[in-house]
């Protein structure tokens, strides 16, 4: 009889030993898997002088890509930019509309995967999210972001601050939440290299 209740925050594997009435022992391997994965990622400007406004994941080296390659190899494709003409309003942008930032003369490309963003700030605590059904519920309850510039509704999470919570849905139908852990903004100091740190929880592939 097993009476312990386990609360998981990561995938686990256990060996269970069983004794029968004749005191014979056998063992079994028990694998316990979450239906979400959690990780932290930092996006950093790719130019030494922090002038490119192209933010990339140092772990994978892929531009516009939020991923923990071991736990979420498919990743979440998005961009990180600032309001045009305003260096203190950080935004996440769906990659299929990133050309609208004005930072790059990108050709409209409907083949780029989309991400839909909603504002989940004050709706949930990041550490309390531990299953996929939570993520869809959070997304459904979250507020729509105001549309800025000529973005399609839901394609930009604007004017981010530290501790903000961003609910999202990927093009392949996975739900997730990102917490803005830290923003190193443009022009805040002379050594600024423009980074954003995100805590991510997302449905597994």
Label each region the model flagged.
Residues 1, 5-205:
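Surface-exposed, beta-sheet-biased, low-hydrophobicity segments with strongly acidic/polar composition
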């Amino acid at each position: 009889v097993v009476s312990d209740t386990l609360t998981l925050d990561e995938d686990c594997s256990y060996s269970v030993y069983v004794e029968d009435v004749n005191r014979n022992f056998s063992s079994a391997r028990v694998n316990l898997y979450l239906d979400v994965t959690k990780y932290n990622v930092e996006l950093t400007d790719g130019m030494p002088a922090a002038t490119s406004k192209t933010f990339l994941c140092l772990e994978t080296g892929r531009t516009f890509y939020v991923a923990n390659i071991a736990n979420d190899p498919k990743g979440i494709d998005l961009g990180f930019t600032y309001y045009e003409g305003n260096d203190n309003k950080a935004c996440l942008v769906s990659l299929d509309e990133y050309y609208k930032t004005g930072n790059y003369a990108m050709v409209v490309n409907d083949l780029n995967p989309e991400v839909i963003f909603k504002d989940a700030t004050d709706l949930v605590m990041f550490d309390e999210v531990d299953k996929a059904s939570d993520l869809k519920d959070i997304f459904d309850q979250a507020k729509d972001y105001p549309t800025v510039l000529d973005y399609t509704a839901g394609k930009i999470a604007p004017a981010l601050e530290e501790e903000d919570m961003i609910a999202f849905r990927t093009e392949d139908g996975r739900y997730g939440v990102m917490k803005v852990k830290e923003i190193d903004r443009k022009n805040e100091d002379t050594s600024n290299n423009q980074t954003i740190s995100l805590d991510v929880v997302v449905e597994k592939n």
